[in-house]
């Protein structure tokens, strides 16, 4: 008969394996103790609408050795130097770093910023990350907090574009404008001046997964404004994230487009959890919603810009296999949408909502 200690160890290991195997992204790489010997395997693990994202896979490893920042003429070894190169790069960090950027950091296409193995903090009172007309970008394993507004100033956008005057920015943690194929995974985001993630101006093919969003009011905006109908082609997957504590609203807030919100865990909200305007399609599947204690805050959803309930009755907002606690409820509308929204490369298994707390227990930066 096995000893009690051995049984306890086996139970513990089985719990870990179960956690990884149920979360398709984590099971793809976290079970390999030698992941640091093949960092680029991470690019094979993305699911959902961003599943084609390559990041810097196939390129060189670039190591950040300095936390210094020069917005116009960055030096080799700094994060800005690597992020603005034209070629594919897999960016890693030589040591723990606190980086306060002087101006927004423009991230060029075919880049992975991989914080695994180091404790990397961005923001710290400065502006943060910006992507414009970029494709194939992966951001993984970063603490992004305290992002602040920036003033008008010159910034190196990329090697090919060069230095441009950049308008003042709002203080978002991550801004994506006209971006295709991007994956934001296992980051911890909080306490910024405006939003934590903005996906706008025709961006599509985006997966936002395994992140921890907390201590912030306006979390995630998908879609530019109600007049920008190019965002009708937007497709975003929001999966395996932990929202809260102290997350106010916009988890996400969508305009136009198609958003699949799957296996996320919501630890209350201040105004609403999922909202939108301009007739977005929102498919909520297998999420766990715990409502605030106030009786007037129980509804998960908020339709914005509808003078009457009938005005947005045809918007397709569906709840499937979600779990509701403390009086939370989801107001569905529209005709049932075809649930086969993914191709074979994008599709992933979605568990019932009562499994979401386990699936998200390792959300955020993994130590």
Swiss-Prot record:
Disulfide bonds join 28-45, 128-147, 306-312. One of its GO terms (biological process) is pectin catabolic process. Belongs to the polysaccharide lyase 1 family. Amb a subfamily. Coiled coil: none annotated. The keyword Hydrolase does not apply. This is Pectate lyase 1. GO terms for molecular function: metal ion binding; pectate lyase activity. It catalyses: Eliminative cleavage of (1->4)-alpha-D-galacturonan to give oligosaccharides with 4-deoxy-alpha-D-galact-4-enuronosyl groups at their non-reducing ends. Its EC number is 4.2.2.2. Keywords: Allergen, Calcium, Disulfide bond, Glycoprotein, Lyase, Metal-binding, Signal. Its cofactor is Ca(2+). Ca(2+) binds at residues 170, 194, 198. Residues 1-21 form the signal peptide. The keyword Lipoprotein does not apply. It comes from Hesperocyparis arizonica. Has pectate lyase activity. InterPro entries: AmbAllergen, Pec_lyase, Pectin_lyas_fold, Pectin_lyase_fold/virulence, PEL. It is an enzyme of class 4 (lyase). Pfam families: Pectate_lyase_4. The active site is at residue 250. Glycans are attached at residues 148, 178, 293. Pathway: Glycan metabolism; pectin degradation; 2-dehydro-3-deoxy-D-gluconate from pectin: step 2/5.
């Amino acid at each position: 008969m096995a000893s009690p200690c051995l049984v306890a160890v086996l139970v513990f290991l089985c719990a870990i394996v179960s956690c990884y195997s149920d979360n398709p992204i984590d099971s793809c790489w976290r079970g390999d103790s030698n992941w640091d010997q093949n960092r680029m395997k991470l690019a094979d693990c993305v699911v959902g609408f961003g599943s084609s994202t390559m990041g810097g896979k196939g390129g060189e490893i670039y190591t950040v050795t300095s936390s210094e920042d020069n917005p116009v003429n960055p030096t080799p070894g700094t994060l800005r130097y690597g992020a603005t190169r034209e070629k594919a790069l897999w960016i890693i960090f030589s040591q723990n770093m606190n980086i306060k950027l002087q101006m927004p950091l423009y991230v060029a296409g075919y880049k992975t910023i991989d914080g695994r193995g180091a404790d990397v903090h961005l923001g710290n009172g400065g502006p943060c990350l910006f992507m414009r007309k970029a494709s194939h970008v992966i951001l993984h394993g970063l603490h992004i907090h305290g992002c602040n507004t920036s003033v008008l100033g010159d910034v190196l956008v990329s090697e090919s574009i060069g230095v441009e005057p950049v308008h003042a920015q709002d203080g978002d943690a991550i801004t994506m404008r006209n971006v295709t194929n991007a994956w934001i995974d296992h980051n911890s985001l909080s306490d910024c001046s405006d939003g934590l993630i903005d996906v706008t101006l025709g961006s599509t093919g985006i997966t936002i997964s395994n992140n921890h969003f907390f201590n912030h009011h306006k979390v995630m905006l998908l879609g530019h404004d109600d007049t920008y109908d190019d965002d009708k082609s937007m497709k975003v997957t929001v999966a395996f994230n932990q929202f809260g504590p102290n997350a106010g609203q916009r988890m996400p807030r969508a305009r136009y487009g198609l958003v699949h919100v799957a296996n996320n865990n919501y630890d209350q909200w201040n105004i609403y959890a999922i909202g939108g305007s301009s007739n977005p399609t929102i498919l909520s599947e297998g999420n766990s919603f715990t409502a605030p204690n106030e009786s007037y805050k129980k509804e998960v959803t908020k339709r914005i810009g509808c003078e009457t309930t009938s005005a947005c009755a045809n918007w397709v907002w569906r709840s499937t296999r979600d779990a509701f606690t403390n009086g939370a409820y989801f107001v569905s509308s529209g005709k049932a949408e075809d649930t086969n929204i993914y191709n074979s490369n994008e599709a992933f298994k979605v568990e019932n909502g009562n499994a979401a707390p386990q699936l998200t227990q390792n959300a955020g930066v993994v130590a």
